[in-house]
Amino acid sequence: STQKGDTYSWLDAQGRYRVKLDFDRNNTEQGYAYLWLRLAKPYAGDTYGFHSPLIDGTEVAVVFDGGDPDRPYIAYALHDSDHPEHVTSDNHTRNVWRTPANNKLRMEDKRQEEHIKLATEYGKTQLNLGHLVNSQREKRGAGFELRTDEHGAVRAAKGLFLTADEQVKAKEPVLEMTSAAEWITRVNSQSDPIKNTDGKEFSSLD
């Protein structure tokens, strides 16, 4: 980038990066006289692909296609002393994809403490699944949590089913309502007619 420490990646119209090679000793202006190189990706096509932008100062490994010095490309990015690895021996059971702005997908593989966290800093909006922990890795709960400091909305055009009935190992159909229907029938059969202040009876639950 022409701006040292730029917050965002600097790409050309083809999505290539400016790269300064270690053996280039020319005292060129920041961001200029560097090579425009493609970044190799695990998934790529004309209308689809995968991209996690690299920002200024990222160390990369440059290789040459078929050993041709005229066909270099970025093979991968590396952590270094200025950009340390965020998965180390302290949290080696975690799988993490995190952006510079701390948008995050984290998957914990420690047995009996498995969890997934999908989060963004905006409004501290998060989806937490499984063994729920805080930033100190202390247990907060278990199950799932969808939370935000902003507004929330739930919409389901064909219906919304909320139940506290157990469904062991998620083996039954998603909308299995037999147990819930039985409870509603039982409550209706056991309830005496309830009257309002006008002396009229409320109808039983349907």
Residues of each region from the PLM?
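Structural signature for extended repeat/solenoid scaffolds and their inter-repeat hinge/linker regions
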Residues: 1-206
